[in-house]
Amino acid sequence: MARTTPIARYRNIGISAHIDAGKTTTTERILFYTGVNHKIGEVHDGAATMDWMEQEQERGITITSAATTAFWSGMAKQYEPHRINIIDTPGHVDFTIEVERSMRVLDGAVMVYCAVGGVQPQSETVWRQANKYKVPRIAFVNKMDRMGANFLKVVNQIKTRLGANPVPLQLAIGAEEHFTGVVDLVKMKAINWNDADQGVTFEYEDIPADMVELANEWHQNLIESAAEASEELMEKYLGGEELTEAEIKGALRQRVLNNEIILVTCGSAFKNKGVQAMLDAVIDYLPSPVDVPAINGILDDGKDTPAERHASDDEPFSALAFKIATDPFVGNLTFFRVYSGVVNSGDTVLNSVKAARERFGRIVQMHANKREEIKEVRAGDIAAAIGLKDVTTGDTLCDPDAPIILERMEFPEPVISIAVEPKTKADQEKMGLALGRLAKEDPSFRVWTDEESNQTIIAGMGELHLDIIVDRMKREFNVEANVGKPQVAYRETIRQKVTDVEGKHAKQSGGRGQYGHVVIDMYPLEPGSNPKGYEFINDIKGGVIPGEYIPAVDKGIQEQLKAGPLAGYPVVDMGIRLHFGSYHDVDSSELAFKLAASIAFKEGFKKAKPVLLEPIMKVEVETPEENTGDVIGDLSRRRGMLKGQESEVTGVKIHAEVPLSEMFGYATQLRSLTKGRASYTMEFLKYDEAPSNVAQAVIEARGK
């Protein structure tokens, strides 16, 4: 089968925003204008096409990044058909992992901001993730029809809060209930959409007289930004020559692809204005798969040789599984992005991470949660496979004759855990299956059994995250669970270097004995300097410990790291240097050295100023002005560090850093302090040393 859409006409984009910026409504309008969805689905009554899990419809927030394919030929049908694959990303901080994994497979992104609320805390998190993956992006300032809407204020916030270089591509004509359309700053014309057909048709008109001066000023700004793309254009511009429309667009495109500028559009998705021109901007300025660098990976050759795959059908097949979802009718759906080559349904591919073969039974392309079966997918495509047995988010699927492991995604460690048990004993096995399946879908969610209490423990990124897991167990798997009190994921570390710590395990009382003897140094590592939080240096000279026993020493210490001596929490940010020891020809064994290492570790840890670390959350509260004092007082009582506050149209925004252990039940407390008028967001920031009284209480509670 030949390719129907050339790869240069693909746009793989994410639509990303803060929780109430109107992202789902924006996506709905995209699906409407691209002709896929003939009745516009509204989030207001819970009927949006992209929000396809029941909870999303009830809560009105987007949880899962569904992938949808649409086609667009331009507002004035000025382009050949372009295929736009849209990945919808959640805006709530407990679902940061969903944003992270979608950023990894996108080529470009549309950042949606609310014209009233502007750049919100979650927008900053998403922005950092987009920076990490170097995703070119444009912005859409939505809700221009709302009270307090101010386009240029949001443009300024993109500059001051995100440190970006925003360049308006349009200006809003009017605002609030007087918002009627936009000025196109490239064409220098006003665009007026037709209300009678929900904005499908439009007219170019003259710019309103009272806006001509402002439009000229911002047009000049746009031209200067374009001229900065090359010396040639700069010379032409400085020489007083006019730049053509094609030159302006080409130059702006280049600068967006280089992540030098962010072009800003505006509108009101709800009022059917602006999304159409934003789609044109996606085609004009965001990259196709061939405009972004080739994907990096390593060959599966035992030497980890670096390799890359280009976005071409002629290269060997390679794809990244970026999401696993459970579908009530077909079981597991594995969403994947094809980076190179072609794959057909029925083909066998290699999961190079697990060294296992998988057969692509059926391949479907999703339109929200409706699906269309397809025979093949090619470089640049995003699709879902049915029937893959053992694929986890982040695995590489590739041609068995050309194995490659693509760059892995990094997933954060959970910061909160709770014990769960089924309400009826009969559901025990069903609960295990449900949790196993949910953990496969979501790598930031973990499940394990506590060895001491034999309880099932689930852990995640926040209270809302775990609420939704428990809710999904009930809805999708029919398992009702009782949940325990949330537990904080503390860590342990050391603050001081200790040298020459000895560990000896010797049992030699006749017959074959056991003998292992090690001497180590222990030292603190800079937090975050080592992704594993642990390093092991082998400094043995002259064979005082034979090489075959060194891994056993490392293993013995790593096993101790899982449950530290202070209170049984994992130990992080610590290094070990093994530099001396002794062995016995007959009695030494791997086990003996493992035990000797654990004795040395416990001994050294006590002397190395051990401390308890607690997770600190970045908390942002928006509250009416009259409640500011109460909110700040309450945060201080929770050991919060105030980091600043600013006045907003809607009240005051307070920035603080608060230990997670003090934030349980905060939503209820905030509601009663402000009569339900305040809102807050919270996300994990860092681990920090817990004060001695807090640490003592935790250690004592664990010791009971």
From Swiss-Prot:
Say where the protein is mainly found.
cytoplasm
Recite the UniProt keywords alphabetically: Acetylation, Cytoplasm, Elongation factor, GTP-binding, Hydrolase, Nucleotide-binding, Protein biosynthesis
Q: Which Enzyme Commission number(s) are listed?
A: 3.6.5.-
Q: What is the top-level taxon of the source organism?
A: Bacteria
Q: Which Gene3D superfamilies match?
A: 3.30.230.10, 3.30.70.240, Elongation Factor G (Translational Gtpase), domain 3, P-loop containing nucleotide triphosphate hydrolases, Translation factors
GO cellular-component terms in the record? cytoplasm; cytosol
Cellular localization per UniProt: Cytoplasm
**Catalyzed reactions per annotation:** GTP + H2O = GDP + phosphate + H(+)
Q: Which SMART domains match?
A: EFG_C, EFG_IV
Q: Which part of the chain is the tr-type G domain?
A: 8-290
The molecular function terms in GO held by this entry are: GTP binding; GTPase activity; guanosine tetraphosphate binding; translation elongation factor activity
Task: Please give the function described in this protein's UniProt entry.
Answer: Catalyzes the GTP-dependent ribosomal translocation step during translation elongation. During this step, the ribosome changes from the pre-translocational (PRE) to the post-translocational (POST) state as the newly formed A-site-bound peptidyl-tRNA and P-site-bound deacylated tRNA move to the P and E sites, respectively. Catalyzes the coordinated movement of the two tRNA molecules, the mRNA and conformational changes in the ribosome.
> Mind telling me which PANTHER family this protein's record contains?
RIBOSOME-RELEASING FACTOR 2, MITOCHONDRIAL, TRANSLATION ELONGATION FACTOR G-RELATED
What is this protein's name? Elongation factor G
Q: Which gene encodes it?
A: fusA
